[in-house]
Regions:
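Zn-dependent metallo-beta-lactamase
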Residues: 1-14, 18, 66-67, 206-208, ...
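Active-site-proximal beta-strand elements of phosphoester/diester hydrolases
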Residues: 1-3, 18-22, 80-89, 105, ...
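Pre-active-site segment of Zn-dependent metallo-hydrolases
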Residues: 8-71, 84-101, 119-130
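Active-site beta-strand termini and strand-to-loop segments that position acidic
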Residues: 11-14, 76-79, 106-109
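Active-site environment of divalent metal-dependent phosphoester hydrolases
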Residues: 26-30, 45-51, 121-124, 144-150, ...
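Conserved acidic residues
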Residues: 37-38, 135, 162
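Binuclear metal-ion centers of metallo-dependent hydrolases, dominated by the metallo-beta-lactamase
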Residues: 72, 98, 163-223
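Active-site-proximal loop/helix segments of hydrolase catalytic cores
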Residues: 89-159, 170
Length: 223
């Protein structure tokens, strides 16, 4: 698994499925990654989450929203991946400011991952129940367009994942995003690990029993 920057991750499953979440393009960073994928998930239809020109191959696209901007009903399988979506909003005003957002839950073998997209509010009890047990949580922490660091910790405490992968925060090279860096999220926390290489190998038996934050270096490869 690699963090490609912003809200985009690259995963390769044991069955060889290459999945990319929320791809972005040069409007976000001139060094936007070019990757080959079998599956692409898109949490919502904003330019920094649905840029497909840098995705090679002939991937299946799982879009969390319909062309009309409503939630799509995603409950699909691709080899060893089962994916479903949970309806949420891009803001704290029931979508009045920025529309709707889809959380993607990915079941891969005995691992459960959740990609929160551009979540704009803390989760309610129904959403928490639908998301369910999560091993690895990909969560926005930069604020402004999404939940901020304080709200992100509320979500973490509600879901109780084993690993938290912060995303959607300011990094060098980003263009025109008034969002905070990751340090606001990690400040004062002892359970933080930093990975310089931007790539991790996820196995259920190797994950911590208590929640840890894993900060990945953004990897912008050509793969």
């Amino acid at each position: 698994m690699r963090w490609l920057g912003h809200a985009s991750f690259y995963l390769e499953t044991p069955a060889g499925v290459r999945l990319v979440t929320d791809p972005y393009g040069p409007q976000v960073s001139p060094a936007a990654p070019v990757v080959t994928a079998d599956v692409v998930t898109i949490s919502h239809e904003h330019f920094d989450h649905n840029y497909l020109d840098n995705i090679k191959g002939n991937p299946v696209i799982w879009r969390g929203l319909t062309p009309e901007g409503d939630w799509a009903k995603i409950d699909v399988n691709c080899k060893d991946i089962h994916a479903y979506t949970v309806p949420t909003y891009h803001d704290d005003a029931a979508g009045a400011k920025r529309g709707k957002n889809a959380v993607f839950v990915l079941e891969i073998g005995n691992l459960r991952l959740a990609h929160l997209g551009d979540l704009g509010h803390v989760l309610n009890d129904e959403q928490i129940e639908k998301i369910g047990r999560i091993d690895v949580l990909m969560i926005p922490v930069g604020g402004y367009f999404t939940i901020n660091a304080t709200q992100a910790w509320q979500v973490v405490e509600a879901l109780k994942p084993r690993v938290v992968l912060p995303m959607h925060y300011l990094v060098p090279g980003m263009q025109g995003f008034p969002i905070a860096g990751v340090d606001e999220f990690t400040a004062g926390r002892a359970n933080v690990r930093r990975f310089g290489e931007g790539q991790i190998d996820l196995k259920a038996e190797n994950l911590p029993q208590e929640t840890e934050v894993w900060v990945l270096a953004a990897s912008q490869p050509r793969i």
